[in-house]
């Protein structure tokens, strides 16, 4: 059974920029169907907005960036969020990750931002907040 996860934008970008490492391994696992990434409107728009920044123009073409998103979309599941869990996190901009994970039944949010995502007022017992390295260790 494939586990569902939310891949935070910081892990997505790290995975694309690095030649190796835990973030790249998480992204590879998603692209190979080993985990099911969940997407919602806010997260998908973050992915697209980040890939549209000029820094990517030096190393990839728009078509290559679209191909990465298409491959990720093919392996993932789109989730509609019907209920907001707000206010919850210190950084309001991160709440959509929790809402996506809960709505989609994710096992984990994979992020480099443990400090903010782990400090929510609400606790969701079955949802783990993990770094890419922690997730890979648990996944084994």
Task: Please report, for each region that a protein language model flagged, where it lies by residue.
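Short, well-structured N-terminal submotif of metal-dependent ribonuclease cores
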Residues: 1-39
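Acidic, PIN/NYN-like endoribonuclease modules and their adjacent C-terminal/linker elements
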Residues: 95, 102-108, 114-140
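PIN-domain endoribonuclease scaffold, especially VapC-family toxins
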Residues: 29-84
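Short secondary-structure boundary segments
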Residues: 9, 41-42, 112-114
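Active-site neighborhoods of divalent-metal-dependent phosphate/nucleic-acid chemistry enzymes
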Residues: 74-114
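Residues that scaffold the ATP/ADP-binding catalytic core of kinase and kinase-like folds
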Residues: 15-16, 50, 59, 120, ...
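Short, active-site-adjacent cap segments at secondary-structure transitions
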Residues: 12-13, 45, 116-118
């Amino acid at each position: 059974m494939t586990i569902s996860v939310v891949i935070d934008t910081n892990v997505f970008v790290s995975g694309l920029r690095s030649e190796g490492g835990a973030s790249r391994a998480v992204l590879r696992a998603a692209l190979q169907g080993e985990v099911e990434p969940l997407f919602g409107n806010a997260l998908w728009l973050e992915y697209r907005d980040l890939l549209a920044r000029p820094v990517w123009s030096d190393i990839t073409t728009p078509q290559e960036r679209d191909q990465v998103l298409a491959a990720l979309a093919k392996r993932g599941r789109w989730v509609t969020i019907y209920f907001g869990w707000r206010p919850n996190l210190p950084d309001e901009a991160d709440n959509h990750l929790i809402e996506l994970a809960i709505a989609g039944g994710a096992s984990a949010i994979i992020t480099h931002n443990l400090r903010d995502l782990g400090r929510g007022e609400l606790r969701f017992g079955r949802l783990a907040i993990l770094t890419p390295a922690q997730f890979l260790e648990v996944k084994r």
